């Protein structure tokens, strides 16, 4: 039994290193060199094919604009202040109850101050009335960064914070700021005049994407009271000269046009559901995404 064990150990040692044939693990030095050379060339070719494929793919991709945008959803509509559960509840005589809402609006509007838009190399005046979309060339680096339209806070009227630092909350007349989320290259298409006949409050303007805020439910419609809109040219919507958006690389300081909405006589001590909706030929709505083209917010002014 001891001999068998010794013989077995000897065969293993001989397999690892055979001094007679000069073999290591059953192969000579030349054989090991050839097989290693084969695998180096084989995996080198695989790596080359992979890198080449990636390079070819990168040549078809622009860093400024996606090649395919056919599945990009229409832009969402959001409001400031941005709050959890989209509920605004406060007492006009209690500053602490609306302090968070006011601070949220103040912080958002910081970049819209005149002092932040003075650089003429970045910003330009695009008029005080709505006009057509402002094309700024192809989506590439040939012309460098593109200029951005200025947006004046004074256009937001009572909701600008210039005359009322509480944005109406102190008087029980809350303001919300509405913006259309950025989508690269998106150009809004306002609805046709005849499609607005069922919305008498909305006036047709071919250069404005209109927005309307109404009561969400039938019982809310009589409680929402008067609604005032403040925007560029006193238009209740988004002017088209701020579109299309060219992205962070070409327009790092881009300012979205804003629309301010003030509710001046909401029914007190009542939770009112309000829906704000943008109207356009290329604005869509989805039951799965309640912010796509619209949003709803609950507002309660307590006595």
UniProtKB/Swiss-Prot annotation:
GO molecular function, one term: ATPase activator activity
GO cellular component, one term: basolateral plasma membrane
Key words, A-Z: Cell adhesion, Cell membrane, Disulfide bond, Glutathionylation, Glycoprotein, Immunity, Innate immunity, Ion transport, Membrane, Phosphoprotein, Potassium, Potassium transport, Signal-anchor, Sodium, Sodium transport, Sodium/potassium transport, Transmembrane, Transmembrane helix, Transport
Cytoplasmic side: 1-34
Modification Phosphotyrosine occurs at: 101
Gene3D superfamilies the UniProt entry points to: 1.20.5.170, Na, k-atpase alpha subunit
SS bond partners: 126-149, 159-175, 213-276
immunoglobulin-like: region residues: 191-303
Chain positions found as Phosphoserine: 11
Membrane topology: Single-pass type II membrane protein
Chain segments annotated as transmembrane: 35-62
Any one of the GO BP annotations: innate immune response
Keyword check for Ion transport: yes
UniProt subcellular location: Cell membrane; Apical cell membrane; Cell membrane, Sarcolemma
Sequence ranges on the Extracellular membrane side: 63-303
UniProt KW Transmembrane helix keyword: yes
PTM (free text): Glutathionylated. N-glycosylated.
Function: This is the non-catalytic component of the active enzyme, which catalyzes the hydrolysis of ATP coupled with the exchange of Na(+) and K(+) ions across the plasma membrane. The beta subunit regulates, through assembly of alpha/beta heterodimers, the number of sodium pumps transported to the plasma membrane. Plays a role in innate immunity by enhancing virus-triggered induction of interferons (IFNs) and interferon stimulated genes (ISGs). Mechanistically, enhances the ubiquitination of TRAF3 and TRAF6 as well as the phosphorylation of TAK1 and TBK1. Involved in cell adhesion and establishing epithelial cell polarity.
Subunit structure: The sodium/potassium-transporting ATPase is composed of a catalytic alpha subunit, an auxiliary non-catalytic beta subunit and an additional regulatory subunit. Interacts with catalytic subunit ATP12A. Interacts with regulatory subunit FXYD1. Interacts with regulatory subunit FXYD3. Interacts with NKAIN1, NKAIN2 and NKAIN4. Interacts with MLC1. Part of a complex containing MLC1, TRPV4, AQP4 and HEPACAM. Interacts with KIRREL3. Interacts with OBSCN (via protein kinase domain 1). Interacts with TRAF3 and TRAF6.
Family, as annotated: Belongs to the X(+)/potassium ATPases subunit beta family.
Domain notes: The C-terminal lobe folds into an immunoglobulin-like domain and mediates cell adhesion properties.
Record-given protein name: Sodium/potassium-transporting ATPase subunit beta-1
Organism classification: Eukaryota, Metazoa, Chordata, Craniata, Vertebrata
């Amino acid at each position: 039994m001891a001999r068998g064990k010794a013989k077995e150990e000897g065969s293993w040692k001989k397999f690892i290193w055979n001094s007679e044939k000069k073999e290591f693990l059953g192969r000579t030095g030349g054989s090991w060199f050839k097989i290693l050379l084969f695998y180096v060339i084989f995996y080198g070719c695989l790596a080359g094919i992979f890198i080449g494929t990636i390079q070819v793919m990168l040549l078809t991709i622009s860093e400024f604009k996606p090649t395919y945008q056919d599945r990009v959803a229409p832009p969402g509509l959001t409001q400031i202040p941005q709050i959890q559960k989209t509920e605004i509840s406060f007492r006009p005589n209690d500053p602490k109850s609306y302090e968070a809402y006011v601070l949220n609006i103040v912080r958002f509007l910081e970049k819209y101050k005149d002092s932040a838009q003075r650089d003429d190399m970045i910003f330009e005046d695009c008029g005080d009335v709505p006009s057509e979309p402002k094309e700024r060339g192809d989506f590439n680096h040939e012309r460098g960064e593109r200029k951005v339209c200025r947006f004046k806070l004074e256009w937001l009227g009572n909701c600008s914070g210039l005359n009322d630092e509480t944005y109406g909350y102190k008087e029980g007349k809350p303001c919300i700021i509405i913006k259309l989320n950025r989508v690269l290259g998106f150009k809004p298409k306002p609805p046709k005049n005849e499609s607005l006949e069922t919305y008498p409050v909305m006036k047709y303007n071919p250069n404005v994407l209109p927005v309307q805020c109404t009561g969400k439910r039938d019982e809310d419609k009589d409680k929402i009271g008067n609604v005032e809109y403040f925007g560029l040219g006193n238009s209740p919507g988004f002017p088209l000269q701020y579109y299309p958006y060219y992205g962070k690389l070409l327009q790092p300081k881009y300012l979205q046009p804003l629309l301010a909405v003030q509710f001046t006589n909401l029914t007190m001590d009542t939770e009112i559901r309000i829906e704000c909706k943008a109207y356009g030929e290329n604005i869509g709505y989805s039951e799965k995404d309640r912010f796509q083209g619209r949003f709803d917010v609950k507002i309660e002014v307590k006595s």
